[in-house]
Amino acid sequence: LHLYYGKKAEGCMDYLLTYYDRGFSGNPYDAGTDRTYSMDSLPQELSCYGNGDFRSASLMLENGDGSMSCDMRYKNYTIRDGKYSLPGLPAVYADNDEAQTLEIVLEDPATGVEAMLLYGVLPELDIITRSVYVRNQSSEKIYVNKVMSAELDFLYGDYDLLTFYGRHAMERNLQRVPVAHGSQMIGSVRGTSSHQYNPMMILAEKDTTEDNGGCYAMSFVYSGNFQGEVLKDQYNQTRMLLGVQEECFRYPLEAGETFYAPEVILSYTDQGMNRLSQNLHSCIRHHICRGKYKTEVRPVLVNSWEAAYFDFTGETLYNLAKEAKSLGIDMLVLDDGWFGKRDDDNSGLGDWYVNEKKLGETLGGLVKRVNDLGVKFGIWIEPEMISEDSDLYR
């Protein structure tokens, strides 16, 4: 069960968890005659589909016999210094003295399938990371049909939901709406997180502003399909979920195989949205970004696209670089139109050879001339795209 997440507190918080006899809320067989223990009303760390919780669940498995029930029970836990990593996935990283990892192992006693809940705690940043992995310890093939990387259940509170919607050339528009009964969802099925919704959600108390008030953030460390959901149940309790998009998701796990879910960054503050942003910024800058530009100032660049679109020569680009240099700009990026027969956006994609006739010189010669000005040179390429009107397609 989930107990508390919020402002740092001293002492035992068990008093927050109260048990009620909720009429027609199912009770586990193990509870015997105790009708106050219901998965449909108690806050959880990993809610499961098919065990009596009729809210949206974090985990949905299809067992070897075709059944869809799942009942993860506590098995053991481990606390260690340092931050866990995720095979093949981006994740927050930290030195051993900057973070601790909590691993909680759950097991379905009927199937032997395990779920490990991973928590990375970075106390100096007010950051907790969450992830889940599912290990098939049964003897049969199973399918993971849904797995949310993070879940927060709130017994009390009246919240607003903040999300960021958008479209091409108008991304990341703030929307703030009250959390109402039922479900409110954001997500993407485009193969990327996309410009339609940012894979992030904020729950804020009603009076929260930029500088004051309590607010919780979930931010997905993943750029593929995603799903975020906030729901209020019949008891005015709120559940917040974020993870991989469940639509058309059906991941097979043979016996002994493991599925690792992408990571979610969580943060809480009682000092308003600005402090929440600072927490996330510090985490991303110092514990996600890598390479030389983690600490170095990135170069300022001028891009040829809005300056010239497809209409340029080597000389006009060189003149653009000279003007850029006079303004203290560090780099010229040659955008679309330098390759093949690419004079509009209906042809040439896929023919990745330099159009020297258009440039009036070799690309290498142009790069050298620009570099001699003390300006770096970058180039645009979109290798996943192809035009029907191209030599490659023909």
Predicted regions: what is each one?
Residues 2-231, 247:
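Polysaccharide-binding surfaces and accessory modules of carbohydrate-active proteins
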Residues 70-74, 251-270:
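Short Pro-Gly-centered flexible turn/kink motifs
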Residues 122, 266-299:
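Terminal connector regions
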Residues 128, 143, 260, 327-328, ...:
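Short loop/turn motifs at secondary-structure junctions
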Residues 132, 145-148, 263, 336, ...:
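Glycine-rich, histidine-containing beta strand-loop boundary motifs that form or position
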Residues 234-254:
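Short acidic, Pro/Gly- and aromatic-enriched capping/linker segments at domain boundaries
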Residues 259, 263-266, 270-271, 370-381:
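Carboxylate/His-rich catalytic cores and anion/metal-binding grooves
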Residues 293-394:
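Aromatic-lined carbohydrate-binding/catalytic grooves of carbohydrate-active enzymes
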